[in-house]
């Protein structure tokens, strides 16, 4: 019984092996057929069909190490000779939407229609508007409009806009304490007068628009007031129309291109000044005109390199070559720093503060010439050196304001502040005449009736 059963089991197992072998043979044959089909198909595509079949397949040809020839468009024909120089000088400006620069063969540039009889018309306007006097309290000083500004676009360096903001805050502080009006410009009023020259059309426009302003005070954006208590000796310039920081000997004897500086100057609102602007401006249009005058200034002014014309060199050139016309009305100031060069100043602030004001020689204006705070790099000095110097100048000036309210910076190298005076409940200016004069200047007091 067991053998019978065992024989049946053995027979069943053999039958199972035969069936499994048949299945394996069938499954092994299937991949082989697929491989053969793929090989034949590939050969068919590569070698192409034979016979007279109308069906054609593109032939594939692989080539190595054969040079590739790319067709290059023919260059455009060269421009006419008269346009070549203009195109070379104007490409960057035209890309930014500006008109082509003025050429040497074009009519000279002008700020606009010549203004005649301005003094008489301004006097008539002032007489008709007594509520806007050209002289104001205290002591009947001239009404002054402080003018500054920066480019309309944001600075390439993100820190630049912050530095410009702090520089403007510094100017607002000084103007508020001394009762001066302030105008901040961020527009190019004339596309031809870019860079340093942008101030000329602006000054002319403000003179005509504000006849009540007796003096216009231009201050560069990178110039910082660093003696907030200093009052300009206005009466010293009563018979002069232009006040510049510099040295007469350097201008008229040496003909030095740095004999004066136009980073901070006063100009009177009168016919003489309008005529000066008209004589000054034709040397400033961007392009070949500015380049040509730059070469002329390099020949006529001592020590000047032959770069494009700048407004400072142009003004010195006018004073030197037309001294009889302009010289008598120009005051060149050297008794205080109307425009002090920053490099010899910024590291001495602590020393000056310890010495106090007894000698009266605190730098009035610290001008960061060559730093260009709006750019990622400086013209002549390491950017970090410039930024550190500006930080110290801002804080030195700001301490003089914060002191009015009982605070001061922890050091000139940081913006952190600390309290320096305990509050007593009395007015802040009690017992401090100088503090009271700044907190409550006389020009803000009501006039007696």
Curated annotation (Swiss-Prot):
Residue span of region Disordered: 1-24, 74-109
Lumenal side: 50-449
Record flagged with keyword Transmembrane: yes
Gene3D superfamilies: Spore Coat Polysaccharide Biosynthesis Protein SpsA, Chain A (3.90.550.10)
EC number(s) on file: 2.4.-.-
Stretches assigned to the Cytoplasmic side: 1-28
UniProt KW keywords: Glycoprotein, Glycosyltransferase, Golgi apparatus, Membrane, Signal-anchor, Transferase, Transmembrane, Transmembrane helix
Gene Ontology cellular component list: endosome; Golgi membrane; trans-Golgi network
GO MF term (any one): hexosyltransferase activity
Biased composition (Basic and acidic residues): 1-14
GO biological process per UniProt: xyloglucan biosynthetic process
Residues bearing glycans: 89, 413, 422
Ribosomal protein among keywords: no
Locations listed in the record: Golgi apparatus membrane
Predominant place of localization: Golgi
Class of enzymatic activity (EC top level): transferase
Disulfide bridges in this chain: none
InterPro entries documented for this protein: Glyco_trans_34, Nucleotide-diphossugar_trans
Membrane topology: Single-pass type II membrane protein
Residue ranges of the TM segments: 29-49
Entry function: Probable glycosyltransferase that may be involved in the biosynthesis of xyloglucan.
Family the entry assigns: Belongs to the glycosyltransferase 34 family.
Name by which UniProt lists this protein: Probable glycosyltransferase 5
Organism: Oryza sativa subsp. indica
Organism lineage string: Eukaryota, Viridiplantae, Streptophyta, Embryophyta, Tracheophyta
